[in-house]
């Protein structure tokens, strides 16, 4: 009798995706982050669902309802901080996952990569709207500043902003719709992640060498299920340490002050995972230019397959490209630091230099380095 997992319509899909999936034998721990992102998404959906049971999306009671969750609901503090810090873990895994894709040339699977870029945008939108919900000072002013950026769009900008706000300022209507979108988007993300996997399994996984590995495949289970379990345990350990020992480490103290439209915080800044993009936005003195640079800082990822000039797929055997890649990583860390600093000398000029270097590295220097490496191989 044939095994049920190979015949049952639903079990067959699970089997072909997680059990009998032919996987390259040499993929490293950098390939763990896909499954870790799946775990993060599940954690976020479950904790978010329980938070939604006690939260009220109303300007008068939103802040109080979050306080009530932390003080009065059984383990409410745990659920709330798991959700808040779970978002940080989500973005850490996302950035490492994207970095892995850039380093090993995984972007050559164009469909998978483009769905991934859309997933990144969707996750960023979800996180932004989630940050508005507690209705603290940074929630309110963050929402005001970021939505206001759309007013830079010529002709329709102002109408668009007022349409998103549902009025003439960030108010009850804005909070209600942000809650609705924040609730529905993770399920859309889950569906998109399914499509992401579907496209990936059409081609099979890439591997560190960037070479075709069809001749050397092993089943996903038990080899990579056990490896992913180790990664999952590491993720849960770090998340637990964060939640139980320093839950406010990555948050902003201003968000413990209820939203007040009459009092602007001294430094308006988003959560740490948006600081690099925020620094790029602020480094351009023109509003529309800043918005375009902000969008392009992420959208430039979609250009990666077209900017690939090397004869080799992976950077494993390309030392010059490796140097530029790690320079890009360092540049992003500098941008993240600058995004959290006030707009004054010397931070302004550092931010501008780092922003120029970011686009220069991706659009010019890395493709040129690849051409140079191609020529070096002709000896």
Curated annotation (Swiss-Prot):
PROSITE patterns: CYTB_CTER, CYTB_NTER. It comes from the Eukaryota. It is found in: Mitochondrion inner membrane. GO terms for cellular component: mitochondrial inner membrane; respiratory chain complex III. The keyword Membrane applies. Signal peptide: none annotated. Heme b b566 binds at residues 97, 196. The chain crosses the membrane at residues 33-53, 77-98, 113-133, 178-198, 226-246, 288-308, 320-340, 347-367. InterPro entries: Cyt_b/b6_C, Cyt_b/b6_C_sf, Cyt_b/b6_N, Cytb/b6-like_sf, Cytochrome_b, Cytochrome_b_C_euk/bac, Cytochrome_b_N_euk/bac, Di-haem_cyt_TM. Its main location: mitochondrion. Component of the ubiquinol-cytochrome c reductase complex (complex III or cytochrome b-c1 complex) that is part of the mitochondrial respiratory chain. The b-c1 complex mediates electron transfer from ubiquinol to cytochrome c. Contributes to the generation of a proton gradient across the mitochondrial membrane that is then used for ATP synthesis. The cytochrome bc1 complex contains 11 subunits: 3 respiratory subunits (MT-CYB, CYC1 and UQCRFS1), 2 core proteins (UQCRC1 and UQCRC2) and 6 low-molecular weight proteins (UQCRH/QCR6, UQCRB/QCR7, UQCRQ/QCR8, UQCR10/QCR9, UQCR11/QCR10 and a cleavage product of UQCRFS1). This cytochrome bc1 complex then forms a dimer. Belongs to the cytochrome b family. PANTHER family: CYTOCHROME B (PTHR19271:SF16). Heme 1 (or BL or b562) is low-potential and absorbs at about 562 nm, and heme 2 (or BH or b566) is high-potential and absorbs at about 566 nm. This is Cytochrome b. The lineage of its organism: Eukaryota, Metazoa, Chordata, Craniata, Vertebrata. The gene is MT-CYB.
């Amino acid at each position: 009798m044939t095994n049920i997992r190979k015949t049952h319509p639903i079990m067959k899909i699970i089997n072909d995706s997680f059990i009998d999936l032919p996987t390259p034998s040499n993929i490293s721990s950098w390939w763990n982050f896909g499954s870790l992102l799946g775990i993060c998404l599940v954690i976020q959906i479950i904790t978010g669902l329980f938070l939604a049971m006690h939260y009220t999306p109303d300007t008068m009671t939103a802040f109080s309802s979050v306080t009530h969750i932390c003080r009065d609901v059984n383990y409410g503090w745990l659920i709330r901080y798991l959700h808040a810090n779970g978002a940080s873990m989500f973005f850490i895994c996302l950035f490492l996952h994207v970095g892995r894709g850039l380093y090993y040339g995984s972007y050559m699977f164009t469909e998978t990569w483009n769905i991934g870029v859309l997933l990144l945008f969707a996750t960023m939108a979800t996180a932004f709207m989630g940050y508005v919900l507690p209705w603290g000072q940074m929630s309110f002013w963050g929402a005001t500043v970021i939505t206001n950026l759309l007013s830079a769009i010529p002709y329709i900008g102002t109408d668009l902003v007022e349409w998103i706000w549902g009025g003439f300022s960030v108010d009850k209507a804005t909070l209600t719709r942000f809650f609705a979108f924040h609730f529905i988007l993770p399920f859309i993300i889950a569906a998109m992640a399914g499509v992401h996997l579907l496209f990936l399994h059409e081609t099979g996984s890439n591997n560190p060498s960037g070479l075709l590995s069809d001749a050397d495949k092993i089943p996903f289970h038990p080899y990579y299920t056990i490896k992913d379990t180790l990664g999952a345990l590491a993720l849960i350990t770090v998340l637990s340490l964060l939640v139980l020992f320093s839950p406010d480490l990555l948050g902003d103290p201003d968000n413990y002050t209820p939203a007040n439209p009459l009092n602007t915080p001294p430094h308006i800044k988003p959560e740490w995972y948006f600081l690099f993009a925020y620094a790029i936005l602020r480094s351009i003195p023109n509003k529309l230019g800043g918005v375009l640079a902000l969008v392009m800082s992420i959208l430039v990822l979609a250009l990666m397959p077209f900017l690939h000039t090397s004869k080799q797929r992976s950077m494993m055997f390309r030392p010059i490209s490796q140097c530029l890649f790690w320079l890009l990583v360092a540049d992003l860390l500098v941008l993240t630091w600058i995004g959290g600093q006030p707009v004054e000398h010397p931070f302004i000029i550092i931010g501008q230099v780092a922003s120029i270097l970011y686009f220069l590295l991706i659009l010019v220097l890395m493709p040129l380095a690849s051409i140079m490496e191609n020529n070096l191989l002709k000896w």
